[in-house]
Amino acid sequence: MQVIKRDGRRQKFDKEKIYNAVSKAFIEVDKELTEQDKKKALEIADYIESLNKNLKVEEVQDIVEDKLMASNRKDVARCYIRYRYLRGLVRESNTTDKTIFELLNGTNEYWNSENANKNAKVVTVQRDYIAGITSTDITRRFLLPKDIVKAHDAGIIHFHDADYFAQNALHNCELINLEDMLQNGTMINNILIEKPHRFLTAATIATQIITAVTSSSYGGATITLTALAPFVRSSYNKYYDKYKKRGMDDETCKKYAMEDTKKEIEDGVQTFNYQVNSMTNTNGQSPFLSVCMYLGETEEYKEELALIIEEFLKQRILGLKNEKGVYITQAFPKLLYVLEEDNIKEDSKYYYLTELAAKCTAKRLVPDYISEKIMKECKIDANGNGQCYPCMGCRSFLTPYLDKNGKPKYYGRFNQGVVTISLPDVALSSKKDMDEFWKIFDERLELCHRALQIRHERLAHAISDIAPILWQHGALARLEKGESIHELLHNGYSTISLGYAGLYECVKYMTGNSHTDNGVGKEFALEVMKKLNDKCAEWKKAEKIDYSVYGTPIESTTYKFAKCLRNRFGIIEGITDRDYITNSYHVPVFEKIDPFTKLALESEFQKLSPGGAISYIECADLTNNVDAVIEVIKFIYDHIMYAELNTKSDYCQVCGYDGEIKIVDEDGKLDWKCPNCGNMDHSKMNVARRTCGYIGTNFFNQGRTDEIRNRYVHLDNHKID
């Protein structure tokens, strides 16, 4: 017999707790506990035990109340009811003190692994977390309905980023309109930033814009290097004129001007990398930034763009130095390299950039790859034209959109937020009854729908003044002061995401098969995905809000979902017996499958995640096998829209070992250990792993660490036939 607590956890029934609670009510009234009182308390406790079934806490308390009211001690019943009411008030009151002190004193491991790119020991991060704790408390007590809070706590759904929800102007992620801001000027902290006249200045201003923009949102941001390309030409022209004035001939002027321009690009990219990785935004972290490298975005400045891309890749291969002065893998920016006809074929003009990208991926985990070819098949606009554009941050994709003039527009658009459904919970709640599954599925989706509507309405009250750099000065719009952002939330300009997690566990429980079986498992998985999309289409049509299906990364939520499933359903082999659940539609990390089969299979599901998705393969050390990386890249171009290769990039600061730092089980806790010297001090090692699309460098919670440990290596260090 178990008692189900308010947060969904289960505890073995303890009769003594009932006896003690009733006894306290008797003592409160009688000032003592008589033998008759003891007898009555024991009688109630025995009765509840005799029911021999799982009960919710509220059900247990209701029984106690009923039994006392049915007795001749209604005064004790009233005392118990009053006590229960007061306890409820305490639960509803501000309960942040304990959480904040745990953070400040470092007594709760949760904060050290809540985000793989945040160090909870640093005061700027602590300040952000304290603000987040307060926001979450306000959100839970005042802004969300009780049933949504309960569903979130029980792991039935996940209401993302409640720690930023109290403010009504914070959205999720965006494609920053850097071109507009650099060409037409912008304002930062009431200072006018005019159009720069050289690449180095433009690159520096870009980092200031990035920091300001990401301080006014909570998700990832993306810029394109295309916005910087015109300033390379400006710099070149300045250098050319300088040498021309010295009386040099045309060829000499061109030669020296190009040398100086390349040196400026090198300096500008280095400054950009230092700034992005050293500056801290108001979220207490480096900006979660992605940088798009897409030659197809410009014809006029394609040569200049190629020079910038080349330098970004070269410097990323080199890395940034740690405190020991050793070059290591940096987390940001994430690099998004678009594969196209101009760079994918060995005889194409820019194939050398793809070779450089492959070397970079083998050593530093980035760039990730977007196939222009496949994306244009997936993203069709209202004119019937295929479109290619980057994701916002790590994986969130906008839907195709045409402006008033019928032209495609992507930069300057954003995502309003995410609510995720736990698909394994739907499956387990149905007890393998397919009719019941679809009934619960629809109910849970409506719960998500209501939560998403609340997100939308929270933003709908915002005016442009609340984040001028976003709404007035070009990052997302150029609205007037005091103007509502309401129009930007409708008719496809921005998206709002219905996330999903654990498709594999859901399918495995309901069918007994993985969705890789090319049979009943895959058919059911595709049906689930199609119904998610059907719901989004239904909501979108009714409300003119761009709902979109999103493959949620669940970086730390994977652990929460796994624990909640065990609390609600116990340990079920192959479903709830791990400390994580599988991301989105992914093949489970432990399943043995070759890289090409995995990518081909997942491409089918990626098309059904239009609001965001990314696939990956896990690789061994490929620094000496770049040819294998090239073959995978070519496969990505022909078969899947967006994918990445996970390699390892570690360094032990104690002994200098730069191979893979291993995960070990130390007394039931997973930890990291240098296989060379045994060092386990996190502060004396650098570990870089992909956790949710981004590279994590600050270690991970137990669930995510377990997932990393179980990853099957799809591509070993051997030649691909």
Predicted features and spans:
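Conserved catalytic cores of very large enzyme subunits
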Residues: 89-90, 96-492, 513-514, 518-676, ...
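Alpha-helical scaffold elements adjacent to nucleotide-binding pockets in ATP/GTP-utilizing enzyme cores
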Residues: 17, 21, 63, 307-312, ...
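Contiguous, well-ordered alpha-helical segments that form the cores/surfaces of helical PPI scaffolds
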Residues: 293, 496-509, 530, 690
